[in-house]
């Protein structure tokens, strides 16, 4: 149980920080076509790397600690949040943006009242992906010695008699992911209803 809480804590912290960074960077880059192309290229490039690659530089800089894993989680999980935020904001029809500008709203008001609500479904899809990426990287982080469910999973998989334990631990990780996904979906659906989105 304590290992499950550590896993949930590390994944949750990673998701919160990754989502904050991803939505901020995505919102800024979506305002400019060149910045959009550059950030999407960066996201595509980072997604081609194997997940273990993210652990190497942080291990060199910070050593074999939970901090290293958290930094790797944040870097890895920021990618979908950034990508889906950019794509969501770029998908807002220009006619609605022009209508907002003609109504006298400034850029910040247009972003808050028009662009973000319409991009909301895309952004929440990105947050869901961020949760999955964060959980995945936390489990991978067990290879460098984190004290979470991932370590038990690795031990179970290396033991011929540990198949049942490995399956049970895998289900625990899946349950954490499903619980977070359900919470996000419930909140997202409520926000859609409030904003009048389909």
Tell me what each language-model feature is:
Residues 1, 13-43:
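Transmembrane-helix boundary motif in ABC transporter permease subunits
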Residues 4, 8, 38-45, 85, ...:
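Hydrophobic alpha-helical elements at and bordering transmembrane segments
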Residues 10-14, 18, 22, 26, ...:
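Alpha-helical transmembrane segments in multi-pass membrane proteins
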Residues 23, 27, 37, 41, ...:
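Membrane-spanning helices that line or support transport/gating and their immediate boundary helices
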Residues 43-77:
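Generic hydrophobic transmembrane alpha-helix motif, especially the helices
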Residues 75, 107-141, 164, 168, ...:
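Transmembrane alpha-helices
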Residues 80-123:
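Short cytoplasmic-facing helical segments at TM-TM junctions of multi-pass membrane proteins
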Residues 143-195:
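Interhelical loop and adjacent transmembrane-helix boundary motif
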């Amino acid at each position: 149980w304590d290992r499950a809480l550590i896993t949930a804590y590390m994944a949750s912290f990673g998701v919160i920080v990754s989502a904050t960074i991803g939505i901020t960077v995505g919102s800024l880059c979506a305002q400019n076509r060149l910045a959009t192309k550059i950030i999407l290229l960066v996201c595509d490039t980072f997604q081609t790397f194997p997940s273990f690659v993210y652990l190497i530089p942080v291990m060199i800089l910070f050593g074999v600690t939970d901090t290293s894993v958290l930094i790797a989680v944040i870097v890895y999980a920021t990618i979908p949040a950034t990508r889906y935020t950019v794509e969501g904001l770029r998908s807002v029809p220009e006619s609605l943006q022009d209508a907002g500008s003609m109504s006298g709203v400034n850029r910040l008001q247009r972003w808050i009242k028009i662009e973000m609500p319409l991009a909301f479904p895309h952004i929440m899809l990105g947050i869901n992906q961020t949760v999955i990426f964060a959980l995945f990287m936390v489990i991978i982080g067990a290879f460098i010695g984190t004290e979470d469910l991932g370590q038990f999973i690795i031990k179970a998989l290396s033991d011929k008699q540990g198949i049942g334990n490995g399956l049970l631990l895998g289900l625990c990780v899946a349950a954490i992911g499903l619980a977070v996904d359900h919470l996000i979906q419930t909140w997202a659906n409520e926000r859609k209803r409030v904003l009048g989105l389909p």
